[in-house]
A protein has these predicted regions:
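Multi-pass alpha-helical transmembrane bundle typical of ion/small-solute transporters
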Residues: 1-421
Length: 421
């Protein structure tokens, strides 16, 4: 096996690893509301979502073309002589996306897997080729503008949809309303899962296509091979089946308490927007769309409580995702190319960066087990969450300190001076 082939295998496996993290990181986008309302049991929900992600990955390749040909300026690299350089750009870009995905999953923050990937690729391309290494027109038109507009549009559509749903269903009894909308929610959540597979699996297809172009296996105007589509579909389905319970909990319980009519409105709005954007090749963040839709259900239902503090932390995560992943991509590219130059090889840097990725991922997974979220506690009341328990512990500690201070002040003066000493 040649060195070039070994590097290609490492890059493809890393791309599929990103696709896997995309699956478990973004499961909540499709199934959080269905799980929160009880329309589907947690494990049933992720199994259904995984199946539909698998199917959705085969429906279109327009987003894959955007990623494969619309971010990195291939004209800046002579593939025939510098294919290894492009391979390193793709590889370290993937590392940036994976590390940011796993980190935000650890904190239960539904940040954008798409923007983590794009940020990693942009950062590594900038480090390797400077400003001219990125196709900025494609970045702005296909990524930045949709990123700003999609959550706003989703929130508006979901707000109107929620208001209409409650208005139309107002004469119906609560029991019939709940049962009927639960079945409706299964349908809209399934459509959302299909949309997620259609949109997100394609992004990894585009990255693998870039790696194949770099290796000289295909030309940049060739069609995406079937094995690439199939492997990406399977990887995202497996990741989805594991269920990103931390993020499912944040989306389903953290922003707003969702009832079944709200779930139907949110999932329906998200699916419609994502499927439409996929048709036009826009690499939307399903996280931004789903979060905007869930927020809209809180605005559209009279008396619903929106937890703006949670929403604010999520927006901060959205804003820093692109630059943070870019920084990781650039740093890992510098490490990789520095080691390759030092050893006069084209693989030592990739191997070391891969080991760094593996070590950090294992550490973050082990750390997550200290406060595990799974199918058994994903729907627990948000008021019983770790944050409230932490605040209670802090309050008890402060009260204990106040009690100690009060005891000291009640001592006679000499004893008080001794206690203060």
């Amino acid at each position: 096996m040649t060195t070039e082939l070994i590097i290609l295998v490492i890059v493809v496996l890393t791309a599929l690893a990103f696709d896997f993290t995309n699956g478990f990181h973004d499961t909540g986008n499709a199934m959080a509301t269905s799980i929160a309302t009880g329309a589907l049991k947690p494990k049933t929900a992720v199994a259904l979502s995984a199946s539909l992600n698998l199917v959705g990955a085969f429906l279109s390749v327009e987003v894959a073309k955007t990623v494969g040909k619309g971010l990195v300026n291939l004209d800046r690299i002579d593939i025939s002589t510098n294919g290894a350089d492009l391979m390193l750009i793709v590889f370290t870009g993937l590392v940036g996306g994976i590390l940011w995905n796993v980190l935000t999953w650890l904190f239960g923050l539904p940040s954008s897997s798409s923007h983590a990937l794009f940020g990693g690729l942009i950062g590594s391309a900038l480090a390797a080729m400077g400003l001219n290494g990125v196709q900025w027109e494609g970045v702005v038109s296909k990524i930045v503008i949709p990123a700003v507009m999609s959550p706003v549009v989703a929130a508006l559509v979901s707000t109107v949809g929620t208001w209409l749903v409650y208005r139309v269903a107002s004469p119906v009894s609560d029991d019939k309303k709940t049962n009927g909308f639960r079945w409706g929610q299964v349908g809209t959540a399934s459509l959302m899962s299909l949309a997620h597979g259609t949109n997100d699996a394609q992004k990894t297809m585009g990255v693998i296509f870039l790696a194949l172009v770099a290796s000289g296996t295909v030309k940049d105007d060739d069609a995406i091979p079937f094995w690439v589509k199939a492997s990406c579909a399977i990887a995202i389905a497996l990741g989805t089946y594991l269920g990103g319970w931390r993020i499912i909990r944040t989306l389903g319980k953290g922003i707003v308490e969702v009832d079944t009519p709200q779930g139907v409105a949110a999932d329906g709005a998200s699916a419609a927007i994502i499927l439409t954007s996929s048709h036009f090749g826009m690499a939307l963040s399903t996280t931004h769309v789903a979060t905007g839709s869930i927020l809209g259900t809180g605005l559209g239902r009279k008396g619903a409580e929106v937890r703006w503090g949670v929403a604010g932390r999520m927006v901060i995560a959205w804003v820093i995702t692109l630059p943070a992943a870019s920084a990781i991509g650039a740093i890992t590219w510098l490490i990789g190319t520095g080691l390759n130059n030092l050893t006069n090889t084209h693989y030592v840097g990739e191997l070391v960066v891969f080991l760094i990725l593996l070590a950090f991922s294992i550490w973050m997974w082990r750390h997550s087990q200290k406060d595990a979220v799974d199918a058994s506690n994903v729907t627990a009341d948000w008021n019983d969450s770790k944050n409230e328990e932490t605040e209670k512990t802090q309050d008890e500690t402060l009260e204990s300190h106040r009690s100690d201070d009060q005891d000291i002040t009640e001592l006679p003066s000499p004893a008080r001076e001794k206690a203060g000493a």
